[in-house]
Amino acid sequence: LLHILGGVDTPTSGSVVIDGTDISRLDETALAIFRRRQIGLIYQFYNLIPILTVEENMTLPLLLDGKKPDKAVIKELSKTLGLSQRMTFLPNQLSGGQQQRVSIGRALINNPALMLADEPTGNLDSRNSHEIIALLRRFNREHGQTVIIITHDESIALSADRTIAIVDGKIVKDGVNG
């Protein structure tokens, strides 16, 4: 499901409409551009490039899109993520929570319409897990981004506005959380 929503896999039927664009009809080049500009991906295992600094990892989507990073945006985002003092560090010099924040920064740098998070707290302790979820909720509120989180952690699922439970490929629960 996450791969279909992220434009990595193609649906066998139907369509996938994100921010008014049917991504299932885009060619590979257009899809790559759309994904880079409109979809933020956060992975359980961070997928940071080990030889790039925190700032370089965060701004990579902009550089791939031929855009010059806005220093004021980077400064504000790094402050929000608690990374201001770590921008020149390499990933191996960071804690797991800090690495996940870099991953979130990279996903947010283009202010995407859709954020897809695959087990974003799976490798973190409970304190860092709650901080990461709070950050995602904050960006949802402040920037109107849709955030879809794939998780096996019931406490994280219950903190969402809406929960859809899928078992063996079928929706077994779809409801608003109170």
Regions found by a protein language model. Name each.
Residues 1-166:
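ABC family nucleotide-binding domain
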